[in-house]
Amino acid sequence: MADVYLVKAVRPRYDKSESLVNKIPELMEKAGIKDVVKDGDVVAIKVHFGVRGGYRIIRPQFIRAVVDVVKGLGGKPFVTDTWGLNHVYDAYYNGLSYATLGAPVIPANGIKENDFRVVKLDEYYWLSEVEVAGNIYDADVLINFAHAKGHGGAGYGGVIKNIALGCVTQRTRRAQHSKEREVGVKAFHEAMADVVKAVLSNKQGKVFHMLWIMDVVEHCDCTAFGMIPLVPDIGVAASKDLVSIEKAGLDLINQAPSVPGSVADKYGLKPGENKFLRIHGRDPYVQVEVAEKAGLGSSQYKLIEL
């Protein structure tokens, strides 16, 4: 069983010290960031840059708070995502830059997605080789800062998807999606687990996961639009266990009431329902199950609210 820490979006009083952004340092400290980031470490902060037209990505001030924590520990952070140089322009358009974040914003696998390291797996579901983004592979530490939201192919995109589809080359992304078309959704989830295993293969004890459970919409951040969040903002979670934080995030979303006027109205979603299964017809908990089976973490967790 792993600990998952949560700072809730609803704060107990109107005070600067209770700001969700200002609680990020405490959240990261409680979740064990000091065990992960050491003085001199080069730290990749993996987020989704979004695209032009979309506006539900993690807000810059939250990423800046993570950058500042890393700097305070002597780390050398950079903020990153794949898709090459064009995606960096998307990041700038969406307000993610050195000026706003206090760290370089660079493509994870080069300006044309040609910078990668081939990682071979001895045990895998479908993919024996994975092309890991070079800057992710070379970094000493990976902070996996994901946005909890829906995903048309996987049903849900959280910390697993942020690595599986966001830390590799276009060829590896296509290899995962092809399993959905050729075999089925579970095979897609299994291929994602293969990729996560490969990406984290040289990061033992040097990975930290964060989940922004805010603006929880039914679509991915790669879409050029934004819809009304389907549940109220829940908060920000952190853990050193990938599977535990993913399971906790899904549970919190499913326990939450729906937001009137959102896609939840169309499906009549109620607290306790598997919301993304209803919306996309794909069970996101399969991601959790296959990742746990692959040895990537535990689905048993203890939720600790700060």
What is each of the regions a protein language model found here?
Residues 2-54, 58-63, 67-306:
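Extended, low-polarity segments enriched in aliphatic/aromatic residues
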